[in-house]
Every structure is written in structure tokens, then in C-alpha cells.
A protein has these predicted regions:
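Peripheral terminal and linker regions in Fe-S/redox and tRNA-modifying enzymes
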Residues: 1-210
Length: 210
């Protein structure tokens, strides 16, 4: 078809679907929204003094650049906790780390932790003023690897090491790749890259969208 013709056909199909029977009524959306409560956000500045001071620390800045994402409420950020240390099995965390993360969530994120298919954790409501202290705590726990969305942020299924359905090993490949690209400057130079590894055709590692 070619990209231009395909784009036109998608637009034509959308015109037929838009406003049709699959469109959600606003009353349904409002009803679902009513089942969720928002945290008690404070009115905070966009750039607090704590963040300005911490910006002089290159380790903090590298982590902030790769692990901290915009929030819809001013003064807050979303923080992704990478579970992809160099040489470690992707997505693994110890019981001690999870206990500590639960405490950090209570202290900095209204008690909320989220788990994504990327095999990382997220603290969804962190005040920007708290980012420097949170970074120090995560660094002590080994959870401040600044590689989110980079070449070493690899998704891998358990593979043949743990899964009876697999016909190939996934984890050792992921571990070796993280060692190969362990230098953070190299990973930054490569830029945003998603490597997904599956040990069989069931594609639990989402290799088809890597």
C-alpha cells in the first residue's frame, strides 16, 4: 500500500467509527472517574529550591533525566524505579528492597506504587522538592540505576531457566547485554531503545514490540 495510502485508509476508517456505537458516553466516563479519588496534592512551585540545589550533582541529574517524568499537577513528578541493575535479572527485587520501597511510597507518594509491564516500579506522585532525598534513598537500595528507556532497560521473560513452556533462555542474554552497555555515557549516546526478549513464541517478553 505504501505509507501515504495506508494513512488515508486509516483516516477514512476512523471517520466511520468516530461518534459511532463504540464511543463512550460522558456519563459512563464520569461514573468510572467517580470511583477513583485523587491524592491530597499541595500547591507547590514548579522549580523548588531543593531541586535547583541538587542540579549541581551530576549523579542526581543523570538519574533525574532518565527516571523522572512529568506529572499533570504542578510541583509533582512520576518517578520510575529501574529494576535493571547491570548484570541483574530484569525485573527482580529483593524482599528487603520491596519493604523499603513501600516505606518510601508512604513517605513520598501518598502510599502508591505501580508496576508496569516494563518490569519496573513507579512512584506516581512525588513532590519535586523531595526528589533529592528520594534519590539518595533509592541509591542506597540499589534502585537508582539511571537507565529507564535506554539500551539496558531490557524486558525479558523468565525463559528456559524457570518456564516449562520456553525453548530458549532469556535472562542470561539480558544480563550480558547490560554488562556490554554498562557505561552510562554509552547508553546515553545510543539514546532511547527498547530491547524485549522472549524465550518462546508466546511472547511474554513482548519481543514483537521491541
Amino acid at each position: 500500500l505504501g505509507i501515504e495510502k495506508f494513512s488515508r485508509e486509516v483516516e477514512e476508517e476512523w471517520k466511520q467509527m468516530d461518534g459511532g456505537g463504540l464511543t463512550l458516553d460522558h456519563s459512563v466516563i464520569d461514573e468510572v472517574r467517580s470511583r477513583f479519588s485523587y491524592p491530597a496534592y499541595e500547591k507547590l512551585p514548579h522549580m523548588p529550591d531543593e531541586l535547583k540545589q541538587a542540579a549541581h550533582d551530576p549523579l542526581f541529574e543523570r538519574w533525574r533525566k532518565n527516571s523522572v517524568f512529568p506529572h499533570k499537577v504542578q510541583g509533582y513528578s512520576i518517578v520510575v524505579l529501574s529494576l535493571k541493575p547491570v548484570g541483574g535479572p530484569p525485573g527482580d527485587a529483593t524482599a528487603e528492597q520491596m519493604d523499603a520501597v513501600a516505606d518510601l511510597a508512604d513517605r513520598y507518594s501518598f502510599g502508591e506504587i505501580r508496576v508496569g509491564h516494563e518490569q519496573n516500579l513507579a512512584l506516581p506522585h512525588v513532590a519535586k522538592r523531595d526528589l533529592p532525598q528520594l534519590f539518595k534513598a533509592l541509591d542506597r537500595l540499589g534502585l537508582a540505576t539511571p537507565n529507564v528507556n535506554l539500551v539496558t532497560d531490557i524486558i525479558a521473560c523468565p525463559g528456559l531457566d524457570y518456564c516449562s513452556l520456553a525453548n530458549a533462555r532469556s535472562i542470561p542474554i539480558a544480563q550480558e547485554l547490560t554488562r556490554r552497555f554498562a557505561n552510562h555515557d554509552t547508553a546515553d549516546l545510543i539514546g532511547r531503545l527498547h530491547i524485549n526478549i522472549s524465550g518462546c513464541i508466546n511472547a511474554c517478553g513482548h519481543h514483537h514490540v521491541g
